[in-house]
Amino acid sequence: ENVLKGKHVGFSHFREEYIEHIAKQQWDNELLRHLSWDALHPWGLEEWKDFTINKGEDDRFLFAILENTTEEFIGWVSLSDVQLKNRGANLGIAILQKEQRGQGYGFEAVSLICKFAFYELGLHKIRLAVNSNNQNAIHVYEKVGFKKEGIDREALFQDGQWLDIYNYGILQKEWLQIIKAES
């Protein structure tokens, strides 16, 4: 059962059946280069289960992203480091399969998590960090309304070169203006 539902994707709580899918996809080089900024070792099913189902973190909301027609698990989206006093959180998202990227699922998932964060949690700001070479993700974030707030220069070493990490943010009032303008 979807917790939140958009036109093409919905969010659900994690189920054990999704974990094996994640474990298989964890070595997709294109996905991996944008998800992690450090050397990785493979996670087993138990580690993925701890990360998703037994998350045990009170300051994180983690949802499975499902395609609405097929109910196929296509990725995850999270709000982490949720701060009640400052009303902020960090956004993370992954669309697992290469053929599912570029289909608008990421845009809709980011829009849905913003709706959840601003309407349901009453957050003031959502932050994210993205590799400077991840142009597809940057396009999605800017299309949703995120603004570049800073650059962590040469913070990431990838393919023999130093890359910047861009820091983005969106305020509740900015998001509400965008939603109002679209309706």
Each model region followed by its residue ranges:
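Conserved hydrophobic/aromatic "anchor" residues
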Residues: 14, 116-118, 146
